[in-house]
Curated annotation (Swiss-Prot):
<dbReference type="InterPro" id="IPR001328">
    <property type="entry name" value="Pept_tRNA_hydro"/>
</dbReference>
<feature type="binding site">
    <location>
        <position position="62"/>
    </location>
    <ligand>
        <name>tRNA</name>
    </ligand>
</feature>
<keyword id="KW-0820">tRNA-binding</keyword>
<keyword id="KW-0378">Hydrolase</keyword>
<comment type="function">
    <text>Catalyzes the release of premature peptidyl moieties from peptidyl-tRNA molecules trapped in stalled 50S ribosomal subunits, and thus maintains levels of free tRNAs and 50S ribosomes.</text>
</comment>
<comment type="similarity">
    <text>Belongs to the PTH family.</text>
</comment>
<protein>
    <recommendedName>
        <fullName>Peptidyl-tRNA hydrolase</fullName>
        <ecNumber>3.1.1.29</ecNumber>
    </recommendedName>
</protein>
<keyword id="KW-0694">RNA-binding</keyword>
<dbReference type="GO" id="GO:0000049">
    <property type="term" value="F:tRNA binding"/>
</dbReference>
<dbReference type="Pfam" id="PF01195">
    <property type="entry name" value="Pept_tRNA_hydro"/>
</dbReference>
<feature type="binding site">
    <location>
        <position position="16"/>
    </location>
    <ligand>
        <name>tRNA</name>
    </ligand>
</feature>
<dbReference type="GO" id="GO:0072344">
    <property type="term" value="P:rescue of stalled ribosome"/>
</dbReference>
<feature type="site" description="Discriminates between blocked and unblocked aminoacyl-tRNA">
    <location>
        <position position="11"/>
    </location>
</feature>
<comment type="function">
    <text>Hydrolyzes ribosome-free peptidyl-tRNAs (with 1 or more amino acids incorporated), which drop off the ribosome during protein synthesis, or as a result of ribosome stalling.</text>
</comment>
<keyword id="KW-0963">Cytoplasm</keyword>
<dbReference type="GO" id="GO:0005737">
    <property type="term" value="C:cytoplasm"/>
</dbReference>
<feature type="active site" description="Proton acceptor">
    <location>
        <position position="21"/>
    </location>
</feature>
Length: 186
């Protein structure tokens, strides 16, 4: 039986796979251990890890809310953890947040429009654009080689944090992050 839904935000298609905006789905790829996600009739790809259902919405970021909401309804699950990029956090930073605003993140706005704002988020810091690059171009671009090293380690830690849902729920995720030395702090 599914107890938690963990949704990794991102855009569909191989051209977006390595972009900053897709770090939420990158975390799910680590958690899957190479297993293939299956398509669900609610326009999601999913993989079950026992009581945790990993979900990749098969929709663009700003349309992810309806597909996540329909899967939650289908499985009668009320506990949601959303994994997403955050430009307001330095590269390599992780933060857990329960509820609150969207900070202009269109994926979160779509989810909040469908479900309200009382869901958990694991924010993955991607930093801010430099040299007057637009935010849209920045989040849809790939990481540099140095940034890739940092974000790869961060994504691995985010995946470990998600596994703490099994034993300790959202408190376990929050405690793991608080006790973990993150790559950006080295």
């Amino acid at each position: 039986m599914c107890v938690y839904i963990v949704a990794g935000l991102g855009n569909p298609g191989p051209s977006y796979d390595k972009t900053r905006h897709n770090v939420g789905q990158m975390v799910l790829d680590i958690l899957s251990g190479g297993a293939r996600f299956r398509r669900h009739k609610t326009n999601n790809f999913y993989l079950s890890l026992g009581d945790i259902l990993l979900v990749k919405p098969d929709a663009y970021m700003n349309l992810s809310g309806p597909v996540i909401a329909s899967l939650m309804k289908f499985h009668s699950v009320s506990d949601l953890l959303v994994l997403h990029d955050d430009i307001d956090l330095p590269l390599g930073t992780l933060r857990f947040k329960q509820g609150g605003g969207t900070a202009g993140h269109r994926g979160l706005r779509s989810i909040s429009d469908c479900l309200g704002s009382d869901y958990a988020r694991l924010r993955v810091g991607i930093g801010r654009p430099e040299n007057n690059q637009s935010i849209e171009d920045f989040v849809l671009s790939n990481f540099s080689p140095v940034q890739t090293d940092i974000i790869s380690r961060t994504i691995q830690l985010a995946a470990e944090a998600v596994l703490h849902l099994r034993d300790n729920g959202f408190v376990g995720v929050k405690q793991f992050i608080a006790q973990t030395k993150l790559p950006s702090r080295t």
